[in-house]
């Protein structure tokens, strides 16, 4: 964890003002995952945390909504007698995917986020390995769940997020998330079952198992604690100056720790809003619609964007002119004149017109891409990490 000993503590906001390493911005401190959810709701309230699509309809999800959902999910798990158990969550990125993750961890359970694209054999293997008792999944996973059902006798409940139950098999273990939510709401409000609020978590206890192939190609379960996740989140906030008025578009798989820690923990701690990309084919359309100020990506996305930029430039026969403009803008920048966003307006417009920086990790990125994007006026903060470190190890701050 970063050294906060020389950092001014802002008592009123419960935050740190990070002044070492040349960074000067507020980092809101929280003690555990639920403490983070509670403090975010207090700071940002009805501000939109997520824009997302469900059943073809655009919806919003506020910071207050997140706290309410975590409270009700935690209460529901306790009411059904499966709090503190091994719980799987799989499927598409969804606000309630995040809420389930946080609620399970906040009730002394172990969350197992699984890749939605793994084979049926891998899925059942991971579930059996962990003695999983509860499965939360989005509607896109219904066919896989149905196909694997005979191998999942240990599972007590299958809870479908964003589904009406019309595709459920004839099995009493299935319920819609809406029904489960009502169970949790009743338990929380009428029976005073409030485990997330009252639980004092062991920060060193395992709260998540992340299956990753790593460098060996053999799947393994990485065990993470709340201390791991909280530390990585606060360090991410300290390095990257994300602000309350920032807008992100989430495009990476949510089961990866990189995406979850950075996009689903660090961004909300800073009060940013995130639009969940509903489909790869809609990415550019969503950039235009939501106008992100920053993105969290892997090199494959950055490489693809880079190739498309130059393909469009070459299509217009403007490569030499653009290179000359880049050289000129770089020279002007050295004397304090920044006209990059004006000169390369067309490039910025392709990303919605407000993109300032990209956080990139997961694999090495070619240095020339970092340099060229900087010439265009888009800073790339390149990071390095591994799942075992949940995942942050190092990152160059904005402007470095």
Predicted regions and their residues:
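Conserved ATP-dependent adenylate/AMP-binding module captured primarily in the ANL superfamily
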Residues: 116-148, 232-249, 280-293
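Conserved AMP-binding/adenylate-forming
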Residues: 57-61, 74-118
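Structural core segment of the AMP-binding/adenylate-forming
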Residues: 1-4, 106-183
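Gly/Ser/Thr-rich phosphate-binding loop
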Residues: 175, 293-296, 305-400
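AMP-dependent adenylate-forming
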Residues: 9-18, 36-61, 166-168
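Conserved AMP-binding/adenylation subdomain of ANL enzymes
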Residues: 230-247, 254-341, 379
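Conserved AMP-binding A3 loop
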Residues: 60-64, 178, 207-233
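Conserved pre-ATP/AMP-binding loop-to-beta segment of ANL
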Residues: 45-48, 160, 179-211, 218, ...
């Amino acid at each position: 964890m970063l050294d906060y000993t020389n950092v001014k503590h802002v008592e009123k906001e419960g935050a740190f003002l990070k002044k070492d390493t040349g960074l000067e911005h507020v980092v809101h401190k929280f003690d555990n995952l639920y403490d983070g959810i509670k403090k975010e709701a207090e700071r940002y309230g009805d501000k939109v945390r997520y824009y997302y699509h469900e059943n073809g309809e655009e919806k919003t999800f506020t910071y207050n909504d997140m706290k309410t959902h975590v409270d009700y999910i935690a209460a529901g798990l306790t009411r059904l007698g499966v709090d503190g158990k091994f719980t799987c969550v799989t499927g598409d990125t969804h606000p309630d995917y995040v809420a389930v993750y946080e609620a399970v961890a906040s009730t002394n359970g172990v969350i197992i986020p699984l890749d939605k694209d793994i084979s049926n054999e891998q899925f059942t293997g991971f579930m059996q390995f962990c003695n999983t008792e509860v499965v939360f999944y989005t509607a896109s996973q219904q066919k896989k769940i149905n196909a694997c059902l005979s191998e999942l006798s240990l599972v007590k409940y299958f809870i479908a997020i964003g589904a009406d139950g019309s595709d459920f098999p004839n099995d009493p273990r299935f319920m819609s998330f809406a029904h489960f939510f009502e169970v949790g709401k009743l338990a929380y409000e009428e029976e005073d079952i409030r485990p997330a609020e009252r639980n004092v978590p062991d920060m060193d206890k395992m709260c998540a198992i992340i299956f990753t192939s790593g460098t060996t190609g053999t799947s393994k379960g990485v065990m993470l604690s709340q201390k791991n996740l909280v530390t990585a989140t606060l360090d991410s906030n300290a390095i990257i100056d994300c602000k309350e008025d920032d807008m992100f578009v989430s495009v990476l798989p949510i089961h990866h720790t990189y995406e979850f820690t950075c996009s689903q923990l660090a961004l909300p701690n800073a009060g940013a809003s995130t639009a969940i990309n509903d489909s790869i084919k809609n990415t550019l359309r969503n950039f235009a619609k939501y106008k992100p100020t920053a993105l969290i990506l892997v090199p494959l996305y950055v490489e693809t964007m880079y190739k498309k930029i130059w393909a469009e430039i070459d299509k217009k026969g403007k490569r030499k002119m653009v290179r000359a403009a880049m050289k000129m803008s770089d020279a002007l920048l050295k004397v304090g004149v920044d006209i990059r966003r004006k000169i390369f307006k067309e490039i910025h417009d392709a990303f919605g017109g407000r993109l300032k920086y990209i956080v990139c990790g997961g694999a090495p990125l070619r240095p020339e891409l970092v340099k060229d994007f900087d010439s265009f006026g888009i800073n790339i903060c390149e990071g390095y990490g591994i799942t075992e470190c949940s995942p942050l190890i190092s990152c160059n701050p904005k402007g470095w």
